[in-house]
Amino acid sequence: MDDRLWEPQNPQKTRMWQFMQSVSQDQGQKFDSYQDLYHWSINNPESFWENICLFFNLGFDSQDYEILNKYPQMIDAQWFKGVHFNFAQKLLSRKDNHPALISINEHGEKQSLSYKELHHRVAQCIAGLKNLGITSGDRVAALMPNTAQTIIAMLASSALGAIWSSCSPDFGAEAALDRLGQLEPKILFCCDGHQYQGKKHSALDKISILHETISSLERVVICPNINEVLDISQLPKACYWNEFILPATECSFTALPFNHPLYVLFSSGTTGRPKCIMHGAGGTLIQHLK
């Protein structure tokens, strides 16, 4: 019985095949199958990850670095020591009119941003964050949906070396506090509300609770999502997105160590308070590329 579920019609046109040829040329070793490549990769992890970086042209080869340190235990392993780069800069390397982001709401309304437009909007958000004194190591949190605006805020935060974390806007205030409150964020991006099965749900009550409860907050930025007009007169730290961003055309990026924190994600919270899980910028980038 053939257990194969699927195979490409033209294997030699796949990115996997191209990577195999690249590794073969670099290593002087012929790979006849995926299994050959797999066994080589697990026996030569340093060479494998170095070849991933070369294949995707990350530019690390121009720096003096150690791929993997000599570690007594696995937990002590440190990758690409000496490499400095910026996660957002790698993602924003293009500035053309090719679509960069496409988001669609539940009504089927589509928003598309080109790389050029995305770069411009991230630059404006970076300027807004800089104006508030955000710098490397600060935490930036969000209660936002999967929209272009959320990605813009994330990229702007990582451009400065700030650490990003977010929750879905349909979380209750307590669930959001259990997660984001642990981080002591300086900035919180919140949508004005969310929509589910055609019904709009205002976020004002949740925003008010987070505004009052997270003492580390210096600014709460409210982003349009359902075009709800919120009364924020009693929230002195709150402002709207258009009040927060500043004029800018070029992004500024801070070069950071390979393992600099990028995201904080969370465990499910089913057996207790959600636990923070930190993901580094370098590992996230090359894993996504791979």
Located regions from the model:
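N-terminal amphipathic, basic-rich helices that act as targeting or association modules
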Residues: 1-75
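AMP-dependent adenylate-forming
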Residues: 23-29, 88-114, 224-232
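Conserved AMP-binding/adenylate-forming core of the ANL superfamily
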Residues: 36-40, 101-155, 172-177, 233-243, ...
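A short N-terminal helical cap/helix-turn-helix that marks the beginning
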Residues: 42, 50-64, 81-102
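Hydrophobic alpha-helical segments in the ANL/AMP-binding
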Residues: 89-93, 130, 148-168, 175-177, ...
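Conserved pre-ATP/AMP-binding loop-to-beta segment of ANL
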Residues: 97-99, 221-222, 233-266, 273, ...
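Conserved S/T- and glycine-rich ATP-binding loop of Class I adenylate-forming
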Residues: 140, 157, 261, 267-270
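Structural core segment of the AMP-binding/adenylate-forming
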Residues: 159-241
